[in-house]
């Protein structure tokens, strides 16, 4: 094993349930994230040599510093990962370690689930490698505890090898990325760097500086309930209004029909009765004009329906969540060019593609710190079929070390 503590560190982290809660109004959204930061990560950060390690209870970020040991390396680089995991069972995570994977199915614990290369052809990229999987009852949490483990391991390596020269390094572990609010209260003044990287990507080589622009859409439908036996010309069924609204959106502009640079409307929840219904959507697109056009379209649909109904029964609430960070990063591509150079020197082919999602880096970039995203190794994230390659995690550590030594 290239880095002795990497695997054990990762296993320790994923066994802690840090699932975030979209319905919470606190920061972090769950107490377990704060406990993870204070009882596990903070003591470890101090033990491996990070300085000024402190937790901010206002924004839920745990931050530490490793000062430069060569004054000629004047850049300051940050590394960021998130502590929370996605909306899937994260209680009693019991990872499996598959040494020297030789292809074929991987049975997930004693469950009836398996990782099958026919369903998940990405498994074929990992022949001969050590894979960490779930037992079929939980997610794994490689998103983003692989990133945390990689950053910690890189710092540990640097402090144990003081002859290796490096620039100033800032480390931040934050909450609630999976529910889209993790960076809302991020304090740039507490993270003085020239640029940063989120270690929150997927397979080997990912280097990303384009994200979706994102909005949340809540639509409330107000009906009028009367006895169905006497409902003619009187009842207005809120559920039918919701169906009508949904059918007016482009049917092929949904996640299951789109890829690459294509945006979408995604219905994530629908509840209600005849009297009142509520539909929740997320809206995503890469180009600013297309993003704005999607929001205008839903407003126009609501206005048209209300005009037809003769009163306001379709109420739209739109909230922007984050924006495509390409707009910021393209102004100064130093972070991207440095990462490309380091990867190529390590014989890693940079895979520069848009993220069909977002990262904390999206918001942080617009706060003034360009923050692209680098691979952390996770595959099939957010569910029971999640896995990660130990060798890919090791390569991520290599990249972190390469970045701070080349700066």
Swiss-Prot record:
It is found in: Cytoplasm. Its cofactor is Zn(2+). Disulfide bonds: none annotated. One of its GO terms (molecular function) is metallopeptidase activity. One of its GO terms (biological process) is peptide catabolic process. Binds 2 Zn(2+) ions per subunit. GO terms for cellular component: cytosol. The keyword Zinc applies. Zn(2+) 1 binds at residues 82, 143, 200. The active site is at 84, 177 (proton acceptor). Keywords: Aminopeptidase, Cytoplasm, Hydrolase, Metal-binding, Metalloprotease, Protease, Zinc. Zn(2+) 2 binds at residues 143, 178, 382. InterPro entries: ArgE/DapE_CS, Bact_exopeptidase_dim_dom, Peptidase_M20, Peptidase_M20_dimer, Peptidase_M20B. Belongs to the peptidase M20B family. This is Peptidase T. It comes from Streptococcus pyogenes serotype M12 (strain MGAS2096). The gene is pepT.
């Amino acid at each position: 094993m290239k880095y002795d503590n990497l695997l054990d560190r990762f296993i320790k982290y994923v066994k802690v349930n840090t699932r975030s809660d979209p319905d919470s109004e606190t920061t972090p959204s769950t107490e377990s994230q704060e406990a993870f930061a204070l009882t596990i990560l903070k003591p470890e950060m101090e033990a491996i040599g990070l300085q000024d390690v402190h937790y901010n209870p206002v924004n839920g970020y745990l931050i530490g510093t490793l000062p430069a040991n060569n004054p000629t390396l004047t850049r300051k680089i940050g590394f960021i990962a998130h502590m929370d995991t996605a909306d899937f069972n994260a209680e009693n995570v019991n990872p499996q370690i598959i040494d020297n994977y030789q292809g074929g199915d991987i049975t997930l614990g004693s469950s009836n689930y398996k990782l099958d290369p026919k369903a998940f052809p990405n498994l074929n990229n990992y022949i001969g490698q050590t894979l960490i999987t779930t037992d079929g009852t939980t997610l794994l949490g490689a998103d983003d505890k692989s990133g945390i483990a990689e950053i910690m391991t890189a710092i540990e390596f640097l402090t144990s090898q003081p002859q290796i020269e490096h620039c100033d390094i800032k480390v931040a572990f934050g909450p609630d990325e999976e529910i889209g609010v993790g960076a809302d209260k991020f304090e740039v003044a507490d993270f003085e760097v020239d640029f940063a990287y989120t270690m929150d990507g997927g397979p080997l080589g990912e280097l990303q500086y384009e994200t979706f622009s994102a909005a949340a859409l809540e639509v409330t439908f107000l009906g009028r309930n009367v006895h169905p036996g006497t409902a003619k010309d009187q009842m207005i069924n809120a559920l039918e209004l919701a169906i009508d609204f949904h059918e007016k959106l482009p049917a092929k502009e949904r996640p299951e029909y789109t890829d690459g640079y294509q945006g979408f409307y995604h219905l994530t929840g629908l509840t209600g009765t005849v009297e009142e219904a509520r539909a929740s959507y997320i809206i995503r697109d890469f180009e600013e004009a297309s993003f704005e056009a999607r929001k205008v379209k839903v407003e126009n649909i609501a206005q048209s329906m209300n005009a037809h109904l003769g009163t306001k029964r379709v109420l739209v609430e739109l909230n922007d969540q984050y924006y495509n960070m390409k707009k910021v990063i393209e102004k100064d591509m130093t972070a991207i060019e440095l990462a490309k150079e380091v990867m190529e020197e390590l014989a890693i082919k940079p895979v520069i593609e848009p993220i069909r999602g977002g990262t904390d880096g999206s918001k942080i970039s617009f706060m003034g710190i360009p923050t692209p995203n680098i691979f952390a190794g996770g595959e099939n994230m957010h569910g029971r079929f999640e896995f990660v390659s130990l060798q890919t995690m090791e390569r991520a550590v290599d990249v972190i070390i390469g970045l701070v030594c080349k700066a």
